[in-house]
Curated annotation (Swiss-Prot):
Keywords: Acyltransferase, Chromatin regulator, Cytoplasm, DNA damage, DNA repair, Nucleus, Transferase. The keyword Cell inner membrane does not apply. Gene3D superfamilies: 1.10.10.390, 3.40.630.30, Histone acetyl transferase 1 (HAT1), N-terminal domain. GO terms for cellular component: chromosome, telomeric region; cytoplasm; histone acetyltransferase complex; nucleus. It comes from Debaryomyces hansenii (strain ATCC 36239 / CBS 767 / BCRC 21394 / JCM 1990 / NBRC 0083 / IGC 2968). One of its GO terms (biological process) is double-strand break repair. Residues 53-55, 206-208 are annotated as: Interaction with histone H4 N-terminus. It is found in: Cytoplasm; Nucleus. This is Histone acetyltransferase type B catalytic subunit. It comes from the Eukaryota.
Length: 409
């Protein structure tokens, strides 16, 4: 295939437009080189932010778009190949489209120049960020999380190289304003080979300032809500429980920061919700409370409020965790509370959450809606709890994933 192929008349194409239409999701092939020089290949989940809602590219036959990154520096390379192209000046150029979302350092077509540029950057390479916490092991490898310094040229350049993954793997994802100093960017590396570490994924989080009262304001005591906006683990590292380790290590770091009073998540996907629930449940039950000690009379007391604040959990997430613990108790015969009591307790929260809508319904319909909502939630809780051994202080049981966000993660 070649991008210097013959140009075909638009009239011929109008007879068979399907031959000249490519799925941009299929055409775009992403490669990331491994530490041994091999390239791992995968396709994006989304391309509509770049190529439009239809996720189609018209005017080319046998279109293949190669978007390649080095595992260590994430130096980008782009090439576009096709067997034939229509003679139509209005056609969108996929090369120009993609280059508008990539940093200026991106090399087009010249693979030798790309390899030389990577090798030059790797000379005396240092991760452009500050280590968060400690280096940790997972299996036979070592990993570290680094907070990028966006005022540093290398840190900013790495951010620009990574950010296109937000568009390709997070639904409704968008670029963050890197000039806004309230953004934090954390990159997870495999550092088994310290000279050439491999990027595993990254997370962005926004720091919302919270007014804590005049006394704290006068004494310059800052309080922030840390909002996770974007969370990506590269596809070849998903399913290895590295996403859970990434999230847990970030949470440990924020737990130790007295300025952070709450950790929240912006518009999570179902897969990230699952990861978060399992991580939060495991951390709560391993380090803080005994599962069997959670009782209905305790949940609406000062004990629960204090626990939530200590764990820096938002109210909705904390309520969900307690409800899951109650369901877990029933499943493992760890409580004297009846299933009916738990059901009524959860239904009460569901009613209060949707009170305005439910009050407009007649009683039979309202009760039916509540029962349907409860049954769906109970089923989802049991799915999340499946495989967790909370009362046995089990090890972390989470999976890697990506999180959706808007506007961005």
């Amino acid at each position: 295939m070649s991008d210097n192929s013959p140009i075909t008349s638009i009239t011929a194409a109008s007879l068979q437009p399907e031959l000249w239409t490519s799925s941009s999701n299929d055409a775009l092939q992403i490669y990331i080189t491994d530490s041994d020089g091999t390239a791992l290949n995968f396709h994006p989940n989304f391309t509509y932010p770049i190529f439009g809602d239809s996720e189609q590219i018209f005017g080319y036959r046998d279109l293949v778009i190669f978007l390649c990154f080095d595992h260590c520096t994430f130096y980008p390379f782009l090439n576009v190949k096709y067997s034939d192209k229509l003679n139509d000046d209005t056609l969108e150029d996929p090369r120009e489209k993609l280059l508008s979302y990539l940093p200026e350092s991106t090399i087009f077509k010249d693979e030798v120049k790309w390899v030389d540029s990577i090798n030059k950057e790797k000379e005396g390479f240092e991760i452009p960020g500050e280590l968060v916490g400690n280096i940790f092991t997972h299996g036979d490898d070592k990993f570290g999380i680094y907070k990028l310094d966006l005022k540093n040229a290398q840190g900013l350049e790495l951010h620009k190289r990574l950010q296109i993954l937000v568009l390709l793997f997070i639904e409704a994802g968008s670029y963050i304003d890197h000039q806004d100093e309230l953004w934090d960017i954390y990159v997870m590396y495999k550092v088994t080979d310290e000279k050439t570490p491999s990027i595993i994924g990254f997370c962005t989080a926004y720091n919302y300032w919270k007014y804590g009262g005049f006394e704290k304001f006068d004494s310059n005591q800052q309080e922030v809500r840390k909002k996770i906006s974007q969370f990506i683990v590269l596809p070849m590292y998903q399913g290895l429980k590295l996403g859970g380790r990434f999230y847990n290590k970030l949470y440990e770091y924020w737990m130790q920061d007295p300025r952070v009073i709450e950790v929240v998540v912006e518009d999570p996907s179902e897969s990230f919700d699952d990861l978060r629930d399992r991580c939060d449940l495991t951390r709560l039950c391993q380090n803080t409370i005994k599962v069997a000690s959670v009782d209905l009379p305790l949940i609406n007391t000062e004990w629960a409020t204090k626990l939530r604040q200590e764990q820096k959990l938002e109210k909705r997430q904390f309520s969900r965790l307690l409800e899951m613990i109650l369901i877990y108790q029933l499943e493992h015969n760890l409580t004297n509370i009846t299933k009916k009591q738990v059901r009524l307790f959860i239904k009460k929260r569901l009613y209060e959450k949707n009170k305005e809508i439910l009050d407009g319904l007649d009683e039979p319909t309202r009760l039916d809606k509540l029962q349907t909502a409860y049954a769906s939630l109970e089923s989802d809780y049991k799915r999340i709890l499946s495989g967790l051994s909370l009362h046995k202080r089990a090890l972390d049981s989470t999976e890697g994933s990506s999180k959706k966000s808007k506007p961005n993660v």
